[in-house]
Amino acid sequence: MPLSLSNRDQNSGHLFYNRRLRAATTRFSVRMKHDDRKQTAALALSMVLVAIAAGWMMLLNVLKPTGIVGDSAIIGDRDSGALYARIDGRLYPALNLTSARLATGTAGQPTWVKPAEIAKYPTGPLVGIPGAPAAMPVNRGAVSAWAVCDTAGRPRSADKPVVTSIAGPITGGGRATHLRDDAGLLVTFDGSTYVIWGGKRSQIDPTNRAVTLSLGLDPGVTSPIQISRALFDGLPATEPLRVPAVPEAGTPSTWVPGARVGSVLQAQTAGGGSQFYVLLPDGVQKISSFVADLLRSANSYGAAAPRVVTPDVLVHTPQVTSLPVEYYPAGRLNFVDTAADPTTCVSWEKASTDPQARVAVYNGRGLPVPPSMDSRIVRLVRDDRAPASVVATQVLVLPGAANFVTSTSGVITAESRESLFWVSGNGVRFGIANDEATLRALGLDPGAAVQAPWPLLRTFAAGPALSRDAALLARDTVPTLGQVAIVTTTAKAGA
């Protein structure tokens, strides 16, 4: 008898009948609102995933067993958090992670194990660098920016300025602005008087009336403020502003009949303006209105005004540049009221693609950063520094500021790359030995270090030098280093 084979529709109906019968017996309903096939598939998939995860964990346990020292160079105690440097099969307690990395010569992470695992190994004395940072994250800022600021005390007082060192670009923050080209600040340092103008400082003699009159300065009205050595060293300097010494001054000129050497000449320009010249033995030199006033204030040779000459006289007279006055101001200065605007800063900025740095002077009623950054200011403990110290009173490291640097000079055209430093978030600079073993252990590339001017960089607190040799020094205990201060807590302050 031939077989009676079922077709596709019969099979589907039979399976449907079985599912409906199963639903009726298990759920007491034949409406089949829930598909058992999907639940079965999900359960099977879950079991497969669990099996895969369990197998992966077993494989990891074989390849890298948890809680076993193995070949790890840096070991950490799970319970206490203590770190050990594994050297020649012996575990040496390390002061911090940076010291452990330097001592072992590796930049790896600690392997955390139980105390029982550590007890299996012989131990040695304490190694490491006291005060070294626990971690050294590197911020590669687009611009290397540094500043030092003085906030002056009361006018005519002996109050010393509060010095703030800033790492990171400054924007003014609504409290300070660039010192205008026609503005000046009268300051004193170490018994001498200076004028800060045009991003630089120039020494003056306040008793020289020719200089003060030409500057627009009345010493009886404008009082100088004392500046710190940090700000003084950070400002580019010019030669002193004094009356230029003109050779053979007062002798008759061979170029302009009736005029004397050292006298000031004035010529009208095509645009209706005036250009000043000083008559020298070998010709005439173009000068600014400030230098013209300065020369005439010293000796006008009886003339009430500069002698006006026609352009043809200048054409037939040699143009020279023998008088060194190129660094003098262009005109009179408007002196800042330091009682209203007591904060003065010098900033240094340079991007990696810049041919030279940019130096600027800021002045205003407060630090040139947003007020929201004031809470990030760290007051350094070393407030009892010597008078000649350049260490700041307080520091501010702005978010994202470049912190792996190589020192260079304060000259804007400086291209040197000298010592390596890493600056912490609390304003401590750590010198880094420029050798392969140290750099490899710290995971640093000296080529990635950005330039930073040493006159500003040295105002940050000095931390210990970081090197592999220093990290391998063994000791029984750590003596107290540097200055200390008591941290005042809220509970203690209210007691």
From Swiss-Prot:
Membrane topology: Single-pass membrane protein
Subcellular location: Cell membrane
Class in the EC hierarchy, top level: hydrolase
UniProtKB keywords: ATP-binding, Cell membrane, Hydrolase, Membrane, Nucleotide-binding, Transmembrane, Transmembrane helix
Domain of life, source organism: Bacteria
E.C. no: 3.6.-.-
InterPro entries, sorted: T7SS_EccB, T7SS_EccB_R1, T7SS_EccB_R3
Function text: An ATPase.
Subunit description: Part of the ESX-2 / type VII secretion system (T7SS), which is composed of cytosolic and membrane components.
Family: Belongs to the EccB family.
Classification via NCBIfam families: T7SS_EccB
Protein name listed in UniProt: ESX-2 secretion system ATPase EccB2
Organism the protein comes from: Mycobacterium tuberculosis (strain CDC 1551 / Oshkosh)
Name of the gene: eccB2
